[in-house]
Amino acid sequence: MEENYKLSHLRELEAESIHIIREVAAEFENPVMLYSIGKDSSVMVRLAEKAFYPGKVPFPLMHIDSKWKFREMIEFRDQYAKEHGWNLIVESNMEAFNAGVGPFTHGSKVHTDLMKTQALLHGLDKYRFDAAFGGARRDEEKSRAKERIFSFRDRFHQWDPKNQRPELWDIYNAKIHKGESIRVFPLSNWTELDIWQYIRLENIPIVPLYFAKERPVVNIDGNLIMADDDRLPEEYRDRIEMKKVRFRTLGCWPLTGAVESDADTIEKIVEEMMTTTKSERTTRVIDFDQDASMEQKKREGYF
């Protein structure tokens, strides 16, 4: 009797990602998985757990905490790491934070550079990681669309889009010199819809902010910003209104816009994704604070 070994498209994506994760574990001395607490990170963490099951994942998680994340994100992070036995490293730029750096006072560009990019680079140098997994996907944004799965970084952690290595089929070049590193994107070929379908298939826990509910938001420059704590400037507080919203992407709460939605279950989110025509990155303020914003940030060492 002939067996049918044809995989569904989700299982094909899963197999590719697991292969990439295992390849990194085999090729590099000290890898780390960057954990943003979002839906893509949650899928990536599940794939890592499956890649080495029933053994322990041979690398830690590292979260770059800007001190402006949604409170529900931090609660979810701590609970998930504890329940699943992950070695969780949390890095923050406390010098900048104690100096009062924030998105409202310094703007998105300065805040992102000091609280996210510089904190990330410090963490990578501190622990001497030579490979860092990220949850970026090519369908998210144009600069990410042209980046390799194994993305080379020089000894300053900088990315040069004109100096990328060829990737033929599933052959990856892990050769680096001392001080250089590789950013690895095992979800490169996934779409936002794939992510949600896989979350449904695997019953992966995610931050409740992804589900629609009544939340206090204020319209700031066309973005529905949730009033997550008392650091919202006084000038915006009298404009707060309750709307049924959810988040398609998560980051620092003053820089992440919500979308009006009734999708309060995974099934409804999947249905919503079937008809959407805009990337989730359109709600991220940091992607539009300068021309070619994301590419420039990546050149400087951003995720």
Swiss-Prot record:
Pfam families: PAPS_reduct. Its EC number is 2.7.7.4. Disulfide bonds: none annotated. Transmembrane segments: none annotated. It comes from the Bacteria. Pathway: Sulfur metabolism; hydrogen sulfide biosynthesis; sulfite from sulfate: step 1/3. It is an enzyme of class 2 (transferase). CDD domains: Sulfate_adenylyltransferase_2. GO terms for molecular function: ATP binding; sulfate adenylyltransferase (ATP) activity. GO terms for biological process: hydrogen sulfide biosynthetic process; sulfate assimilation. With CysN forms the ATP sulfurylase (ATPS) that catalyzes the adenylation of sulfate producing adenosine 5'-phosphosulfate (APS) and diphosphate, the first enzymatic step in sulfur assimilation pathway. APS synthesis involves the formation of a high-energy phosphoric-sulfuric acid anhydride bond driven by GTP hydrolysis by CysN coupled to ATP hydrolysis by CysD. NCBIfam families: CysD, PRK05253.1, PRK12563.1. Heterodimer composed of CysD, the smaller subunit, and CysN. Belongs to the PAPS reductase family. CysD subfamily. This is Sulfate adenylyltransferase subunit 2. It comes from Phocaeicola vulgatus (strain ATCC 8482 / DSM 1447 / JCM 5826 / CCUG 4940 / NBRC 14291 / NCTC 11154) (Bacteroides vulgatus).
